[in-house]
């Protein structure tokens, strides 16, 4: 699968592009909604761009509840799992 640091960098970049924030606001512990005000609609849009970027099929990501992945680090971990085609655990929020 892809390198996690590379995935994290891409996740941060795509979020930054989508919402118009500088990349450095996306710290590892920063809550996308609570701290940055990025609502679930924007998170879903960002996630679609991210999975598209990494060639992850929509079917693999269809059951993901993004509320369970509130930080860029959590999203990056999820993307690595999906990219490796692992069985997902803990997707139900």
Summary of predicted features, one role per range:
Residues 1-93:
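4′-phosphopantetheine-dependent carrier domains
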């Amino acid at each position: 699968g892809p390198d996690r640091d590379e995935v994290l960098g891409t996740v941060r970049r795509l979020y930054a592009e989508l919402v118009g924030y500088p990349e450095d606001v996306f710290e590892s512990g920063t809550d996308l909604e609570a701290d940055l005000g990025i609502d679930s609609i924007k998170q879903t849009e960002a996630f679609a761009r991210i999975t598209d970027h990494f060639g992850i099929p929509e079917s693999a990501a269809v059951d993901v509840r993004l509320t369970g992945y509130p930080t860029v680090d959590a999203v990056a971990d999820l993307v690595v799992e999906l990219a490796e085609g692992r069985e997902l655990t803990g997707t139900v929020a």
